[in-house]
Curated annotation (Swiss-Prot):
It comes from the Eukaryota. Component of nuclear RNase P and RNase MRP complexes. RNase P consists of an RNA moiety and at least 9 protein subunits including POP1, POP3, POP4, POP5, POP6, POP7, POP8, RPP1 and RPR2. RNase MRP complex consists of an RNA moiety and at least 10 protein subunits including POP1, POP3, POP4, POP5, POP6, POP7, POP8, RMP1, RPP1 and SNM1, many of which are shared with the RNase P complex. Residues 1-21 are annotated as: Disordered. This is Ribonucleases P/MRP protein subunit POP7. It catalyses: Endonucleolytic cleavage of RNA, removing 5'-extranucleotides from tRNA precursor. Component of ribonuclease P, a protein complex that generates mature tRNA molecules by cleaving their 5'-ends. Also a component of RNase MRP, which cleaves pre-rRNA sequences. PANTHER family: RIBONUCLEASES P/MRP PROTEIN SUBUNIT POP7 (PTHR28256), RIBONUCLEASES P_MRP PROTEIN SUBUNIT POP7 (PTHR28256:SF1). GO terms for cellular component: nucleolar ribonuclease P complex; ribonuclease MRP complex; telomerase holoenzyme complex.
Length: 140
């Protein structure tokens, strides 16, 4: 019985996830908080309280808290805290945010180990991906 050689090329892909584009006005910068999955809960509470204290200086009536992906649960938990404990009016908006991922296609794994090809020289491709998100508006 003859052994078959594996003749297909193995190409590996490395995905680099990029954050969403943030187009905010000067007023929105001072009234918007972005929550990541790694943001500590208590730090986010303190930051929101600080923004709520200075929201009148910015001429706004609410603070927007934005979270997407894994941070949706933490963002909603922050909203529940301000609604239940602080008796603030909360509005919740769901969103779908499109982000771009950079996919780097590498040739055969054996060839790449030996060659000194830099990351800039490899074939890159951008792929669009939709991520779910939530926006909380906490009113003063």
């Amino acid at each position: 019985m003859a052994l078959k050689k594996n003749t297909h090329n193995k190409s590996t892909k490395r995905v680099t996830k990029h954050p969403s584009l943030k187009t905010l006005t000067h007023k929105q910068i001072h009234t918007t908080i972005f929550v990541k999955s790694t943001t500590p809960y208590v730090s986010a509470l303190k930051r929101i309280n600080k923004f709520l204290d200075s929201v009148h200086k910015q001429g706004s009536s609410y603070v927007a808290v934005l979270g997407m992906g894994k941070a949706v649960e933490k963002t909603l938990a922050l909203g529940c805290h301000f609604q239940d404990q602080k008796n603030k009016k909360i509005e919740v908006y769901t969103k779908t945010i499109e982000v771009l991922d950079e996919v780097i296609t590498e040739g055969q794994a054996d060839i790449d180990m030996e060659s000194d090809v830099e990351d800039d020289d490899k074939e890159t491709q951008l792929k669009k991906r939709a991520v779910s998100g939530v926006e909380l508006r906490i009113y003063v």
